[in-house]
Amino acid sequence: MDPIKEALTYDDVLLTPKYSEILPSETVIKTKLSKNLNLKIPIISSAMDTVTESSMAIAIAKLGGIGVIHRNLDIKRQILEIRKVKSKNLKVGAAVGAGPLEIKRAEALLKEKIDLIVVDTAHGHTKKVAEIVKKIKKLKSKKTTLCAGNISTIDAAKFLSKLGVDAIKVGIGPGSICTTRLVAGIGVPQLSAIMAARKGLGKKKIMLVADGGIKFSGDISKALAAGADAVMIGSLFAGTNESPGKIIKKNGKYFKSFRGMGSVGAMNKGSADRYFQKKQKDPSKYVPEGVEGLVKYKGPIEKIVYQLIGGLKSSMGYLGSKNIKDLRNKPKFVKITKAGFYESMVHSIDEVKK
């Protein structure tokens, strides 16, 4: 057995400030997921059935990012959601799985001239993922960007890069409603996972998407500094006007549903194969790797994205980084203690004014 390594996530570290001549307002946060897919902001909305359908994808695209339409829909309904976005001349992505019938979904989606197709599985370092990636590469045009995941190791990054994907999705278990690390005991803390994937790619011009675990705008800066080209966000966007589902009133407060794609509800709706399980008539036969619950109603997505982008720009100002490439130029992380983490949070105040 190899020595047990230490692995870190966003809350374990801080970026140390550098000499700067750059103001936050002067920073440029555009990025790309391939030669043909440029984004004005490094934000992607997650392919979750309580996060991204056409309303979310339209809103994110208008703000400069891209949304990925989830695959817990029949093919016709997923295409309908895509067309709603494309009818406004906006960029859109769509998710497919690695199951035996998913190539039919991929064929249908690619006919819609989507900008991004995502092979969305819980474990991207597998034979099944390799098989569908190879098939999609033969079908897709050069204008459609191919992303596959999820992974968290050097070897997995090398594996997917050899298949010729444009982008790789990193993250096994960091999401707020994901229980893979508890149920399966599998995963790598997200910051270390991003660094491992970037190391595995070497000098290859393959983009990384950090998927999961973003709680604050500062986490985006840490993810990009560690090697990501964009972040995928779920929980922060759940509960907004644009997320699927109705507003629920409970005890005088307003909520919307939010669930992991590994929850029983989501798996029963169609995402079971994402976790390499079969659809069951009896829900108790699932081994869920996610939970389902409620999140507070948050209003329009635009306000949230504005704060996230503002925080990222502020971070880049502290680091003297004009753009994301500069942000990744020899960043200096410091590992912090539990006391350092608590010091970073709001403290010594009885009530925060909202």
Language-model features, listed with the residues they occupy:
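Alpha/beta catalytic cores of nucleotide-metabolism and tRNA/nucleoside-modifying enzymes
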Residues: 1-21, 95, 163, 185-210, ...
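Active-site entrance/lid segments in N-terminal catalytic domains of soluble metabolic enzymes
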Residues: 1-207, 237-240, 343
